[in-house]
Amino acid sequence: MSNNVYERNRIKNDRYESGVIPYAKMGYWDANYSVKDTDLLALFRLTPQPGVDPVEAAAAVAGESSTATWTVVWTDLLTACDVYRAKAYRVDPVPSAADQYFAYIAYECDLFEEGSLANMTASIIGNVFGFKAVAALRLEDMRIPYAYLKTFQGPATGIIVERERLDTFGRPLLGATVKPKLGLSGKNYGRVVYEGLRGGIDFLKDDENINSQPFMRWRERFLYCMEGINRASAASGEVKGSYLNVTAATMEEMYERADYAKAVGSVIVMIDLVIGYTAIQSMAIWARKNDMILHLHRAGNSTYARQKNHGINFRVICKWMRMAGVDHIHAGTVVGKLEGDPLMVKGFYDVLRETELSINLPQGIFFEMDWASLRKCCPVASGGIHCGQMHQLVYYLGDDVVLQFGGGTIGHPDGIQAGATANRVALEAMILARNEGRDYVSEGPEILRDIAKLCGPLKTALDLWKGITFNYTSTDTADFVETATSNP
């Protein structure tokens, strides 16, 4: 008997021995595995239970997220099980973290239904996060193969087409969230939209929890918002919009609201992350068919994305949402009130905006990845930002971003229109300084003070918020370098 035949028989006898055997012995660990271009790769941060070998824990995750159950089953012999088993092929200790390991796992592409985010995630995150062999588990990064990416639509509109529709180039887009989130009547809501747009920003926005409550039903809100948009557009000569939140209890209701938004002239609609992956993909398909921009509010993400040792890293959510087809997603500000280490946020933005990804461990990007010509998704920076931070925002986030000032517009002492004007003037001044070759990062405060001499609303805003910062240490920081989380 040849050595190859003997080895195959040995593996078969060992692997299909009745009872409970280690996952690594069942074929879910292969240190010599050669990764294929068509493999989907996942990187997990493992914290094994005391006494559990890291390799066995990695094999257990591979098994439970692909074909395994807790015991050997003879029906494996009826499948191409050696092909369909996920393979953990590498385990590395996490730098400066005791008892944590990076586990690399490869999945055959045929394990996943084409174009279905729900099916892919049912495997990758379906059962394993409650598995007893691991004390904690976090999905840090994924490489989606080119062949599988081509089965997804990608962003409904994309950054390039959105700029063409708005006829706005060479600067970040400006937005603001209507405040207070809840309680306004439709007429007052529409007035906020008008004042903000008339002051110079590009978009107003519903917040995540404004849908159709007793104090303001959705039709009323849509109509008053569109009146404000149309008046502001006519007065300014600029294309304007307001993110009309069509999130609802059922898909039928969401389609009805989205169709109505289009019928009354909106260029953009909004949904919340909490509606689920299938609903998000469905709305993205609707948006592509109807030439609408689709904004996604990441409501709920920090319940599983913020903690460093358990959950899902937000960069993975960014990849999934670009695949699903949204045009905008909130992705952090660095300088605002929400979680956001500078390197981590840069990684999120690269995932959304680049056509190809290179390995960048300080930013948490572990895999090279070609986006297969899927359109770019525009990051949105919102949460505790104001015009006095404009130099930092432009430096960290670049041009292809929506800078969304909610309280930083609505909270201006002289009114909403003055707040919007302050933000627009601050942005235009910073872009001009950058284009002139000035060191706008270090000179930013001086640039703002100089232009404020010519703009009363900006001077008032700078005086009001000059001491406001949110320099808390981020929870999610880089594993491979020391990371400064304070702002320059």
Swiss-Prot record:
Secretion signal span: none
Site annotation Transition state stabilizer: residues: K337
Residue positions binding substrate: N127, T177, K181, R298, H330, S382
Keywords: Calvin cycle, Carbon dioxide fixation, Chloroplast, Lyase, Magnesium, Metal-binding, Monooxygenase, Oxidoreductase, Photorespiration, Photosynthesis, Plastid
GO BP term, pick one: reductive pentose-phosphate cycle
InterPro entries linked to this entry: RuBisCO, RuBisCo_large_chain_AS, RuBisCO_lsu_C, RuBisCO_lsu_C_sf, RuBisCO_lsu_fd_N, RuBisCO_lsu_N_sf, RuBisCO_lsuI
Chloroplast as UniProt keyword: yes
Annotated positions binding Mg(2+): K205, D207, E208
Needed co-factor(s): Mg(2+)
Intracellular or extracellular location(s): Plastid, Chloroplast
Superkingdom of the source species: Eukaryota
Active site (catalytic residues): K179 (proton acceptor), H297 (proton acceptor)
Gene Ontology molecular-function annotations: magnesium ion binding; monooxygenase activity; ribulose-bisphosphate carboxylase activity
GO CC, one annotated term: chloroplast
First-listed, main subcellular location of the protein, grouped into a coarse class: plastid
EC number(s) reported in the record: 4.1.1.39
Family the entry assigns: Belongs to the RuBisCO large chain family. Type I subfamily.
Free-text function comment from the UniProt entry: RuBisCO catalyzes two reactions: the carboxylation of D-ribulose 1,5-bisphosphate, the primary event in carbon dioxide fixation, as well as the oxidative fragmentation of the pentose substrate in the photorespiration process. Both reactions occur simultaneously and in competition at the same active site.
Classification via NCBIfam families: PRK04208.1 (NF003252)
PANTHER family, alphabetized: RIBULOSE BISPHOSPHATE CARBOXYLASE (PTHR42704), RIBULOSE BISPHOSPHATE CARBOXYLASE LARGE CHAIN (PTHR42704:SF17)
Other remarks in the entry: The basic functional RuBisCO is composed of a large chain homodimer in a 'head-to-tail' conformation. In form I RuBisCO this homodimer is arranged in a barrel-like tetramer with the small subunits forming a tetrameric 'cap' on each end of the 'barrel'.
Assembly and binders: Heterohexadecamer of 8 large chains and 8 small chains.
Protein name as catalogued: Ribulose bisphosphate carboxylase large chain
